């Protein structure tokens, strides 16, 4: 294992896990998402290039990937800095920033935000989905990809000495591509060398998380230090969810605040409401999985920011936690989800 054993690595350097505080395990603070632009229907075509205004805000909320400006979160650093200060004032301590190669990771900006706000920021190493892989990435062997991941954690990312503290979010499509499979195998190998936390973005199919875990296990990953993201848009059947939970990864519900009629990336999915998410957390807790749950908002478009009438980074602390208590989830379980589980996950073995 690496010299980071027993520590958490932030963009400002290693810290003890007791310094984390309330932790959001899946956010973005500076990224671009043009890779996932969805052209709007012809009658609404002009809205794709329109600025985000009060009069079209509802449309943008329902069609977040069809407005080009909305996909450029990296333009809102000043607003995000102010939001992080509000997050800290609400009792927040740390944010895991899951932007990886392919969606404009900017570790220099993350360091600046950490210095300005006092929030611990943990950056992610690795690669997003195949659609963002460069020809160079696709041509790499598993061994070469492993070396990239290890170096981003031990040496620094993007030509800097600013180091990543997790591997992820590692992007997976459905069906999984050969390039993504190699990245998963490299992730497992790098994790076995480093003892580091891993975060996975599964494809949009309920079988995807199972396939990913199998590939990781076969390549030697530690599933107990792996988070499976986006379960709130991926597995809806309770029986299937329990089957997945038995595999031992952390179960991440990370779209709190996102409530929409149509999910643009998969029209077959009825995006759950926050009340639905809380019900699913309660179900998992009642089944004995309170030690494996983590939560977040996955803010990755402008409309989710307070500046644009969105829920912002403090939504879970300000609004979801009180509702969890109303719905019978104990403070002890809430503390596990927001404090203890992130500590265990983020600490290097």
Swiss-Prot record:
Top enzyme category: hydrolase
Keyword vocabulary terms for this entry: Cytoplasm, Hydrolase, Metal-binding
Catalytic activity, reaction form: N-acetyltaurine + H2O = taurine + acetate; N-propanoyltaurine + H2O = propanoate + taurine; N-acetyl-L-methionine + H2O = L-methionine + acetate; N-acetyl-L-isoleucine + H2O = L-isoleucine + acetate
Residues that bind a divalent metal cation 1: 26, 28, 169, 298
Record text on cofactor binding: Binds 2 divalent metal cations per subunit.
Claim: Hydrolase is one of the keywords in the record: yes
InterPro entries: AryldialkylPase_Zn-BS, Metal_Hydrolase, Phosphotriesterase
Cytoplasm found in the keyword field: yes
Known EC number: 3.1.-.-
Intracellular or extracellular location(s): Cytoplasm, Cytosol
Domain of life where this protein originates: Eukaryota
CDD domains according to UniProt: PTE (cd00530)
One example of a Gene Ontology biological process annotation: taurine metabolic process
GO cellular component, as recorded: cytosol
Cofactor(s) essential for the protein: a divalent metal cation
Residues noted as binding a divalent metal cation 2 in the record, renumbered to the chain: 169, 201, 230
PANTHER family named among the record's database cross-references: PHOSPHOTRIESTERASE-RELATED, PHOSPHOTRIESTERASE-RELATED PROTEIN
Family of this protein: Belongs to the metallo-dependent hydrolases superfamily. Phosphotriesterase family.
Function: N-acetyltaurine hydrolase that catalyzes the hydrolysis of N-acetyltaurine into taurine and acetate. PTER also acts on other N-acetyl amino acids (Met, Ile, Leu, Val) and N-propionyltaurine, but at lower rates.
Protein name, as recorded: N-acetyltaurine hydrolase
Taxonomic placement: Eukaryota, Metazoa, Chordata, Craniata, Vertebrata
Gene responsible for this protein: pter
């Amino acid at each position: 294992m690496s010299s980071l054993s027993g520590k958490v690595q932030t963009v400002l350097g290693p810290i003890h896990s007791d310094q984390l505080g309330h932790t959001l395990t899946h956010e973005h603070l500076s990224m671009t998402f043009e890779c996932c632009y969805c052209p709007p229907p012809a009658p609404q075509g002009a809205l794709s290039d329109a600025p985000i205004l009060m009069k079209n805000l509802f449309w943008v909320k329902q069609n977040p990937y069809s407005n080009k400006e909305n996909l450029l979160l990296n333009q809102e650093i000043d607003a995000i800095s102010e939001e992080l200060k509000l997050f800290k004032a609400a009792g927040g301590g740390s944010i895991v920033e899951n932007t990886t190669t392919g969606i404009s990771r900017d570790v220099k900006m993350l360091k600046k935000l950490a210095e300005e706000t006092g929030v611990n920021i943990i950056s992610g190493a690795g690669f997003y989905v195949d659609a963002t892989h460069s020809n160079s990435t696709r041509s790499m062997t598993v061994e070469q990809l492993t070396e990239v991941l290890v170096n981003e954690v031990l040496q620094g990312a993007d030509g800097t000495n600013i180091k990543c503290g997790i591997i992820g979010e590692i992007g997976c499509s459905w069906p999984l591509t050969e390039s993504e499979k190699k990245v998963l195998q490299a992730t497992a190998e790098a994790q076995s060398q480093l003892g580091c936390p891993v975060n996975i973005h599964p494809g949009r199919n309920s079988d995807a998380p199972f396939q990913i875990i199998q590939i990781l296990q076969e390549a030697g990953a530690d599933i107990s230090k792996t988070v499976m993201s986006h379960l709130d848009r991926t597995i809806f059947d309770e029986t299937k969810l329990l089957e997945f939970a038995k595999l031992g990864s952390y179960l991440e519900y990370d779209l709190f605040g996102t409530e929409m009629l149509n999910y643009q990336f998969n029209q077959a999915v009825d995006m759950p409401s926050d009340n639905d998410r809380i019900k699913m957390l309660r179900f998992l807790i009642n089944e004995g999985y309170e030690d494996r749950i983590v939560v977040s908002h996955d803010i990755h478009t402008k409309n989710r920011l307070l500046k644009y009438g969105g829920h912002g980074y403090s939504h879970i602390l300000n609004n979801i936690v009180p509702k969890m208590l109303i719905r019978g989830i104990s403070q002890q379980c809430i503390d596990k989800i927001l404090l203890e589980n992130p500590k265990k996950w983020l600490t290097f073995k």
